[in-house]
Design a protein with these regions (language model features):
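The feature marks the mature, well-folded catalytic cores of soluble enzymes
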Residues: 1-172
Length: 172
């Protein structure tokens, strides 16, 4: 039997960068948190806990039932987060280290610009995924679909301008 190892394995560079951001903060004084799961990997999450990071859920933050205090350190995961959460972090006066993947940020910026121009936005992705919840929160007029079948049902107005975008981690 011959086993050939793939050239590219492991985490994407966005996740690696988020892990690097956390590792660079290990020696910082004060309480350290990660907003949501840094990555969908139990070993990495446990490693970050051993290094002193605690998990804070977006829902807890938005409902003010978390234990964040002014000047605590909060790392935003590679998937990013919603507009409301960004505003809440600013309001809470915590030190934010935004480790959102550059590709996710690029999509978010494109959506924000299209939204400001009054475009309608068509977005393919898993509406329950943290990345999608985050990027779509920056638009007012957005239609989300998860499959080609759902996309075929979208009503298109030929008089409108549309931006078509997709989740970076889409597996379909």
């Amino acid at each position: 039997m011959v086993i050939i190892r793939a050239k590219h394995m492991g985490f994407c560079f966005g996740v690696l960068e988020a892990i690097n951001v956390c590792n660079s903060l290990v020696e910082e004084k004060g309480r350290k948190y990660i907003l949501g799961m840094l990555v969908h990997n139990k070993q990495v999450v446990e490693d970050m806990e051993r290094k002193g990071f605690k998990l804070v859920k977006e829902e807890e933050l938005l409902e003010d039932i978390d234990d964040l205090k002014e000047n605590d350190i909060v790392v935003v995961r590679a998937h990013g987060t919603s507009k409301n959460v960004h505003e809440k972090l600013k309001e809470r006066k915590v030190k934010v280290y935004d480790a959102t993947c550059v590709f996710v940020n690029k999509i978010r910026q494109e959506i924000e610009i299209a939204n400001e121009k009054g475009y309608s936005i068509l977005f393919m992705g898993d509406k329950n995924h943290p990345e999608v919840k985050g990027v779509i929160s920056f638009a007012d007029n957005i239609q989300i679909f998860e499959s080609l079948e759902e996309a075929m049902e979208v009503k298109i107005d030929s008089d409108k301008t549309y931006l078509l975008s997709t989740q970076t981690t889409l597996n379909k």
